[in-house]
Amino acid sequence: MKEIEVKLRISDVVQTRRRLLEAGFEPEGERVFEENWLYDFPTQTLRQSRSLLRLRKSGDRAIITFKDPPEGNLRYKMRDEIQTEVAEAEVMRDIFRKLGLNETFRYQKYRTAFRIRDESRGHVLLDETPIGPFLELEGATDWIDQAASQLGFSPGDYILKSYVTLFRESCPEQEFEGSAMLFGSTYSQPNPKG
């Protein structure tokens, strides 16, 4: 499946939620806590190729995702992804370890998904992370532009970086240990200068 997305930095979750509802978006479900683990081989083959292997625990669900390297589009983050649900996240973590994969990064967030009723071309994800809140718009490129405009954003606001990169950029260099973006962690606080 082709994933096409952009992130948007927001400052106020309550105001953004209100703006989403006023624009006709409806929550697809409850706000869910997500735990994410990224994996790579000791040789960092995946990182070097800009691919990604992630295990996500989202509420009661556990999902494995593999993402190909992003395409060269400068306006949207586009990449092929394959994912499947697994029964137990902890068992999958053990399997990855036994296969020789290393956990390279762990991050947490709260996510609420929104969609316009009877619209299947895209959805908005409201992410509350330790480095601040973001919207992710996922869908067709024209839908992303239209939804962003409805919410008061323009293509100049689009962020194509991963949460790992945003986290690393938000940490003072001397403090960054690089392995986790967790709520309540010393290393999950954004750099006030950033």
Model region roles, listed by residue range:
Residues V124-I131:
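A contiguous pocket-lining binding segment that forms or flanks enzyme active sites
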Residues P27-E28, I144-Q146:
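Short loop/beta submotifs within extracellular cysteine-rich repeat domains
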Residues K57-G59, P130, T141:
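A generic beta-sheet turn/junction motif
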Residues M1-R121, D157-G194:
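N-terminal strand-loop-strand beta-hairpin
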Residues D145-I159:
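Long, well-ordered alpha-helical scaffolding segments within enzyme catalytic domains
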Residues K67-P69, T129, A140:
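Surface loops and adjacent helix of pleckstrin homology
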